[in-house]
């Protein structure tokens, strides 16, 4: 990595980062469904990691992750005045619901609502945040509740 002053992407480090991200943002069920055999799993991993390495800059990745290192919204949650939905899925490994953080903190937001989407074949761990077919109805509900005069 050379302190970020590299001339070639540090493939070994990026491959390790890909592995961690893959495990943290997916779900075992979906991974098994996509690649039910060891051979399919290895092919999928090789393809995914090589694609990741080709399109990811190590410095950008470090910057993005470091930017959230000390992020803590809790002290200002009570200042949120609008209708607010916090949506999570039961299989989220990055924000595991069993820690109870959203259960506790949503109470600080006057118009806050915590929605925990149960595990299903449609959820995919933390990656569920990119699947509006799972949470789109809640977005529609929030938009309607946010209309003037509602």
Mark where each language-model region is.
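Alpha/beta-hydrolase-fold enzymes
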Residues: 1-51
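Active-site nucleophile elbow and catalytic-triad environment of alpha/beta-hydrolase enzymes
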Residues: 60-76
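Conserved alpha/beta-hydrolase "acid-adjacent" motif
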Residues: 72, 93-101
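Short, conserved loop/helix-junction motifs that constitute active-site signature segments
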Residues: 77-81, 106-110
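Short beta-strand/loop motif that positions the catalytic acidic residue
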Residues: 80, 86-88
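Acidic beta-to-alpha connecting loop that harbors the catalytic carboxylate
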Residues: 90-92, 119-120
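Catalytic active-site module of serine/aspartate enzymes centered on a nucleophile-bearing elbow/loop
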Residues: 109-150
């Amino acid at each position: 990595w050379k302190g970020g002053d590299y001339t070639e992407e540090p493939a070994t480090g990026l491959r390790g980062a890909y592995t961690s991200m893959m495990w943290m943002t997916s779900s075992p069920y979906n991974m098994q469904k996509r690649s039910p055999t060891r051979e399919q799993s290895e092919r999928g991993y090789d393809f995914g990691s090589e694609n990741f390495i080709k399109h990811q800059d190590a410095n950008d990745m470090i910057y993005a992750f470091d930017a959230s290192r000390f992020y803590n919204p809790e002290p200002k949650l009570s200042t949120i005045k609008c209708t607010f939905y916090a949506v999570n899925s039961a299989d989220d490994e990055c924000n595991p619901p069993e820690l109870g953080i959203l259960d506790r903190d949503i109470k600080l937001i006057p118009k806050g609502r915590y929605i925990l989407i149960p595990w299903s074949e449609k959820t995919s761990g933390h990656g569920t945040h990119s699947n509006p077919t799972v949470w789109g109805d809640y977005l529609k509900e929030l938009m309607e509740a946010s209309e003037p005069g509602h």
